[in-house]
């Protein structure tokens, strides 16, 4: 069997993504019922972190342990990834020691080079370009609360960042409508828009957050300046009209969900009233990172 990498939603088939989501639901239910299975007994996951992390580190570590495997954490400063040793050599060496590699990095190119040279599965834990694991958790969370996402409308307001890039890919893979409102100069990368449209994504772009959110089934945002992207920082006055507050949520459907990958800058991209309110499912999202990633791990390792 060829090596199964999980680099982006665009690189995995719709059928495999749906298989993983269904598997995540089953694994979550079994855990809640007290069932314990260890399909990854004896397997080791190397976790490489160029960027600090809470959810990614803990969810992959706990997830691997719940599946019976083990983890080893490596930081960019410890490894000097791509500096004292080439990424290609690192990939080849780690492939001799471990069964899979997860990387959270500021550089998507590092992920791709690692994938090209590793002989074990490589998982994208987050890059400056995409965040596919987050979208797996988001779709799982939406469907837990509202049923199949196909045909529904999801709205994004804020910065055109890595989460939005994966959301664009998800819109094509999972067949939902995506409305996007970003300020001028903060647009998502054109390559992700083009890929989504070429694969059936139904996209609508606007400068108006109210227009984007109108009758949406779910409203999604993220921090205005992503970690490691401070050089892209723009004045809050540029983004302030895109804040998700009660007034903006009123334009969505009455039962609309609110999502945020966390950590949230309360009072900036979202108000306390919304993130702590009845629309919010942000902590369900965070929990589902664990279960969605367990399904990704099992798929990558053929378990």
From Swiss-Prot:
It is found in: Cytoplasm. It catalyses: carbamoyl phosphate + L-ornithine = L-citrulline + phosphate + H(+). Carbamoyl phosphate binds at residues 53-56, 80, 104, 131-134, 261-262, 289. L-ornithine binds at residues 162, 222, 226-227. Reversibly catalyzes the transfer of the carbamoyl group from carbamoyl phosphate (CP) to the N(epsilon) atom of ornithine (ORN) to produce L-citrulline. NCBIfam families: orni_carb_tr, PRK00779.1. HAMAP family: OTCase. This is Ornithine carbamoyltransferase.
């Amino acid at each position: 069997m060829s090596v199964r990498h999980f680099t982006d939603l665009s690189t995995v088939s719709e059928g495999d993504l749906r298989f993983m989501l269904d598997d995540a639901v089953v694994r979550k239910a079994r855990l809640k019922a007290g069932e314990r299975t260890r399909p990854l007994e004896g397997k080791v996951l190397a976790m490489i972190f160029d960027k600090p992390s809470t959810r990614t580190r803990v969810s992959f570590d706990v997830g691997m342990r719940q599946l019976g495997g083990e983890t080893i954490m490596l930081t960019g400063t410890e490894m000097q990834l791509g500096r004292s040793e080439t990424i290609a050599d690192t990939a080849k060496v780690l492939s001799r020691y471990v069964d899979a590699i997860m990387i959270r990095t500021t550089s998507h190119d590092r992920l791709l080079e690692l994938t090209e040279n590793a002989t074990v599965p490589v998982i994208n834990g987050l890059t400056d370009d995409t965040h596919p694991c987050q979208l797996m958790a988001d779709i799982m969370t939406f469907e837990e609360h509202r049923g199949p996402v196909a045909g529904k409308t999801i709205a994004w307001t804020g910065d055109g960042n890595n989460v939005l890039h994966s959301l664009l890919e998800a819109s094509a893979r999972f067949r939902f409508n995506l409305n996007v409102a970003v300020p001028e100069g903060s647009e998502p990368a054109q390559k992700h828009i083009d890929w989504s449209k070429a694969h059936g994504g139904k996209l609508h772009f606007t400068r108006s957050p109210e227009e984007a959110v109108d009758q949406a089934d779910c409203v999604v945002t993220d921090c205005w300046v992503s970690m490691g992207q401070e050089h892209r920082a723009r004045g809050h006055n540029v983004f302030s009209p895109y804040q998700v507050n009660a007034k903006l949520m009123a334009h969505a459907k009455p039962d609309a969900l609110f999502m945020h990958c966390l950590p949230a800058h309360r009072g900036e991209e979202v108000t306390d009233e919304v993130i702590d309110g009845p629309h919010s499912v942000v902590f369900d999202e965070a929990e589902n990172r664990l279960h969605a990633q367990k399904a990704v791990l099992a798929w990558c390792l053929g378990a």
